[in-house]
């Protein structure tokens, strides 16, 4: 999958892409990241990509021309869906990541300053995405999060596709507690069931622990979750089923 990232600060993106899973994914050919410096498309000798807003006001606005030229250039190759990372976009979730993972390529536009000339958005943007109700100094960190979250869904990137299936938010459940060596840490022991070797018992324990964690920390997620017959039986055994049904009936 190809990720095109438009930015005026390409160095902000390079280091995270050269470490860990994202580096391996690029080396294996699972993903390709094309960082595009918007300044290269500026028309003046100072490579200016921003100007004062019409109507006055504080700050600067990113100019439409360099952005449009950059997108036009990418479209000659493979731009895919052009996405503007902005607080006004639709909320980014695991479902959106899975949706984007179906694309062969996407282009992420990183805004800066007070925003981007609206005319560029009207003519060139296909989608707008927001990571949440907070403000960043630019879209670069958001772009990296999108690249990371989409890449790990792609076949072979994690090396274990089951890791993707069992991730938090692959269902509307938080992940169960995790433990590793030593068996006892500051008086706290690893639950016995995890040392039993009984795979079904371990799976059941983790499922219940996941539901309990979600119920206490993010109960709203359970309103959308659907359980199969066996899971419902387990929930009833642990006095959780009626609580979840009551939660789902609130709306």
Curated annotation (Swiss-Prot):
GO terms for molecular function: tRNA (guanine(37)-N1)-methyltransferase activity. This is tRNA (guanine-N(1)-)-methyltransferase. CDD domains: TrmD-like (cd18080). The keyword Methyltransferase applies. SUPFAM superfamilies: alpha/beta knot (SSF75217). It is found in: Cytoplasm. It catalyses: guanosine(37) in tRNA + S-adenosyl-L-methionine = N(1)-methylguanosine(37) in tRNA + S-adenosyl-L-homocysteine + H(+). It is an enzyme of class 2 (transferase). The gene is trmD. PANTHER family: TRNA (GUANINE-N(1)-)-METHYLTRANSFERASE (PTHR46417:SF1). It comes from the Bacteria. GO terms for biological process: tRNA N1-guanine methylation. Belongs to the RNA methyltransferase TrmD family. It comes from Desulfotalea psychrophila (strain LSv54 / DSM 12343). Its EC number is 2.1.1.228. Its main location: cytoplasm. InterPro entries: Alpha/beta_knot_MTases, tRNA_m1G_MeTrfase_C_sf, tRNA_m1G_MeTrfase_TrmD, tRNA_m1G_MTases_N, tRNA_MeTrfase_TRMD/TRM10. Homodimer. GO terms for cellular component: cytosol. Keywords: Cytoplasm, Methyltransferase, S-adenosyl-L-methionine, Transferase, tRNA processing. S-adenosyl-L-methionine binds at residues 111, 131-136. Specifically methylates guanosine-37 in various tRNAs.
């Amino acid at each position: 999958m190809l990720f095109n990232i438009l930015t005026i600060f390409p160095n902000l993106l390079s280091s995270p892409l050269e470490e860990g899973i994202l580096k391996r994914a690029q080396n294996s050919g699972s993903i390709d990241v094309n960082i595009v410096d918007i300044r290269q498309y500026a028309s003046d000798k100072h490579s200016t990509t921003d100007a004062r807003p019409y109507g006055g006001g504080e700050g600067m606005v990113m100019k439409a021309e360099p952005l449009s030229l950059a997108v036009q250039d990418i479209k000659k190759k493979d731009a895919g869906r052009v996405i503007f990372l902005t607080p006004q976009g639709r909320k980014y979730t695991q479902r959106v990541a899975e949706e984007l993972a179906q694309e062969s390529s996407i282009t992420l536009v990183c805004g800066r300053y007070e925003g981007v000339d609206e005319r560029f958005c009207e003519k060139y943007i296909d989608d707008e995405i927001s990571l949440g109700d907070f403000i960043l100094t630019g879209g670069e960190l958001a772009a990296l999060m999108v690249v990371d979250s989409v890449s790990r869904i792609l076949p072979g990137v994690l090396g274990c596709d089951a890791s993707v299936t069992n991730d938090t938010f692959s269902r509307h459940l938080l992940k169960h507690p995790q433990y590793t060596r030593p068996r006892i840490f500051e008086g706290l022991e690893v639950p016995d069931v995890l040392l039993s070797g009984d795979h079904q018992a371990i799976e059941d324990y983790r499922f219940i622990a996941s539901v309990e964690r979600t119920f206490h920390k993010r109960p709203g997620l359970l309103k959308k979750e659907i359980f199969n017959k066996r899971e419902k039986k387990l929930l009833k055994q642990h006095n959780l089923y009626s609580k979840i049904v009551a939660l789902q009936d609130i709306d």
